[in-house]
């Protein structure tokens, strides 16, 4: 973090990165040069409004990371310079002049803090127009006339940044005008939505400059993506300065500039000035609509043959950059709601846009056709409601998960006294949820529905199970067992809490507690039994033999099984020959043909059960065996997908989007990290976090004995590396650490890789415990605590490490000035410095300290917008109280002070 004036950039770079400032009630703001603009190019912050095409040169491939770092550096350079001005103001002896200058600086600072990137809603669309031409072109007079209605003859060499409201097709836009002081550069080309080329009709050089600027712009960006307007100014034409560029030459140039529109203007009395900017705004809006129509069908319907054209009035003009700036664009929502139809009229398209917010609705069903992604059931005897559901299965909007399987199933009621079978509209989604509604209408209206999280469930078919194991064979070891399903079942059972399970695997409806093979299977405290794993293979189900009813152990969970007593027997399914009066199952001694009878009866219904680890059961029944098979397989696939998603969740959060190997390699490549910090053994793979250094495995064992207050040891390959720890390791390294801890060797020799452990331990303890070789502090009359504050402000990492190594707990917790209360941790949090914040906490700075206004370091981190610093502080117990308190600025201006700006101010301790 650089607090040098200008953020280490040239004035031209600062100008090109600056955006329009905010603050002030004027309809437009004139901020020449843009030195106090908001962070990021433009109000939306964020690069080109259209994707660059046509194979741009290599220099255009500027990474987002580099651009972001440059913008942060520019942004953070403003406040230190402003506060340096405040310090200089204090030296002015004339108090009246001092107060006047201070008020002006405060106004500038407030305009910077309240720029549109911090205040303007992302829903406000923007148009970014660049004005280019040489100093004699008259472009500054053109812009000034448009903004103020007056004529100013002077040309602005540095250009300017301006804002004005403009209305296009009945919609208001924030027009950002960038008067470029020189030729178009890469950043300018990436920023603009449109370009106005300006030349003077009485100046040949300005005329020739236009085409040179055009060629330069084309080297950075495809000219077909940028609307252009050519303007010839008449302001300087007089008897002494006659017209040099005739109309034919000007129109020939407009043809060379991709046939752009040509205007002649006069800023003296306003000829065509308003028309130029209105026309360029119209061109930008029209281009965006054209791109929306081109992108929309491809985005939602990659295989659609054709779409009818949509009039411009039917689609609201929306800034295409909103997708980048605000997270989503209105158009992306619009395009995702276009249905999968070969041809769509304008009227239907408007209906779809209106109905997209409530998914699905009866309006959406009017223009639907039968979906071809679900299999037809022409051979099945389905009732009318089921056929209607099948015809309208694609009536699913973008607001809900798309089902991978859906249809009408019978579900048994969970009420103990009246367990009836009722029709339900059941959907299985790819997010691991099984939902059911009383009807298709309720599903489409998203009401009266219930859902089952399949993560901790299994699916079973009553009367069918895995082949029974013999007493000498462990359950589940049959060669025909499905290993994948067994593994899933074990994972589910292992993840349960509060419910004991046995090691053996049996069927939920056929427990055998008296058998030696199932001796471990008995009801738990909540009536739970160990369940067998689900196997979707039909031959495994068919091989299972039903047990006699006298040997069946009834389930005692919340929902009774089908083998329970006669008085609790639920009524048979309506699908079973549609007989509502089927007789009760016999619970007496079975006949010799009992098993076959049970199998025949099981074939009459096509039921399957979803069972959770908590003992809940949901009974469903399909119309055919094939349909049940498909449902069971689909549910099992989603159970497996849910489990796999849980297993990979940790991997996704370890390094965010970074690859572990790349992150570790980045730590290894830091200067000095190729050798152990203590014995110089090659390729160290252990780390000390607070030292920011790598070491060999033998030295790491010695460091562990030092204690975590001296060295926090972690494996480079075996442990997790969150971003904040990686930031510390990559910022420091062995070379920096040894420049501090071995800064005063005075002839001592380090032990080598072949030295014995005792010798290495003596060296390490002398180095870190006794601090015998610690580099001396620089000679200064400033106390150590104040030097620490200075090191944080100046972003001096080596000095910070040295001061922390020398300092006591009282010294590192010293505050800045009397009555201020800010510690070094407050300052590092306000500066969003993750490395300094983490090191200060490790070396004993109090995370609970508060400044004079009652603010904790967490409040400073949140005001600075640093989620990384906030996470570190919360992890170490920093309280969040006080983050909403308004700080009291140190300076005491009369009016207009912005409290939030004070948190960005680094203390003036130099």
Swiss-Prot record:
GO BP of this protein: cellular response to reactive oxygen species; proteasome-mediated ubiquitin-dependent protein catabolic process; protein import into nucleus
CDD domains per record: ArfGap_AGAP3, Centaurin_gamma, PH_AGAP
Domain GLD: 122-296
Matches recorded under InterPro entries: Ankyrin_rpt, Ankyrin_rpt-contain_sf, Arf-GAP_GTPase_ANK_PH, ARFGAP/RecO, ArfGAP_dom, ArfGAP_dom_sf, P-loop_NTPase, PH-like_dom_sf
Residues binding GTP: 133-140, 177-181, 233-236
Region (Small GTPase-like): 119-410
Main location per the UniProt record: cytoplasm
Quaternary organization: Interacts with PML. Interacts with expanded polyglutamine proteins.
Protein name as catalogued: Arf-GAP with GTPase, ANK repeat and PH domain-containing protein 3
Naturally occurring in which organism (per UniProt): Mus musculus (Mouse)
